[in-house]
Regions:
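An acidic-aromatic pocket/loop used at catalytic or ligand-binding sites
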Residues: 17-133
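Sec-dependent bacterial lipoprotein signal peptides
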Residues: 1-15
Length: 133
């Protein structure tokens, strides 16, 4: 193998190792997108994902969808979020849409399959000039 080929392979490997959107960036963007929100007490994080525009946090709780959704409706109102819409479907899923200073927040709460509890998803937008105070 020539030196040039080895150099190209090393550079390609180094570039491939530095991936944008690593865990640190995901946490930073999720923190920005979900700033001012609250997680239900005793929840466990399932996953977090984020891009430049939005972030999603999936959590699990041992409590029922009814209990968790009522808590969120109270907590959002107490923390200056305006609940715009709440929908429930026949499967027990509850969807809540709220805004705080033009910033949207979507919550989807689903009953766990095969056991008690709730899995909920929080989706927020990374603030821009139009969504900041």
């Amino acid at each position: 193998m020539s030196r040039a080929t080895a150099l190209v392979l090393i550079c390609a490997a180094l570039i491939g190792c530095e991936r944008p959107g690593g865990p640190e960036q995901t946490r930073r963007l999720a923190g920005q997108a979900l700033q001012g929100t609250l997680a239900y007490p005793r929840s466990t994080m399932v996953s977090v994902s984020a891009g430049e525009e939005a972030a999603q946090l999936v959590m699990s709780s041992p409590d029922s969808v009814t209990v968790v959704s009522k808590w969120f409706l109270r907590a959002l109102a107490m923390n200056n979020w305006e609940v715009k819409r709440t929908l429930s479907d026949a499967n027990g899923t509850v969807t809540i849409y709220a805004e705080q200073h033009k910033r949207p927040l979507w919550l989807t709460l689903r009953p766990n399959v095969g056991g008690p509890g709730t899995t909920y998803t929080m989706i927020g937008v990374v603030p821009t000039d139009s969504t900041k105070k």
